[in-house]
Amino acid sequence: QGYSSAASDVYKRQEYIGVDACAVNLMRPAMYGAYHHITVMGKEDQPCDHMYDVTGSLCENNDKFAIDRYLPKVDMGDLLVIHDTGAHGFAMGYNYNGKLKSSEILLHEDGSFEMIRRAETPKDYFATFDCFDIYNKINFDA
């Protein structure tokens, strides 16, 4: 009686793009896998021939804006635009892990843009603390 055995290993090389945004800024992809189009500024006309996971800065495994997303080659310092976040970013935002809410930028059809909500500051974050007199002890101007 003979035996036959085979072993197989599968290696998947995955490339990641870590961004300074996170689920605090846009919770929908982390909660239920919502799709948001992502572009790389200045590379809109380049081929989307590199596959990435676009990950946020939280220490949570579901803090991802995209999984297996084809984008142009992304280099350190490139700016990514996560589209169509309008009503969901700030309204669903929260301060998990002490993360501050980001500013909101409106991209107009003609390509111009404007800031419609400033970024949250540490002073904003601590303004509602009402214990240990912490707000008055922090030097926000340092």
Where are these regions (language model features)?
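C-terminal accessory subdomain/extension
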Residues: 12-17, 21-142
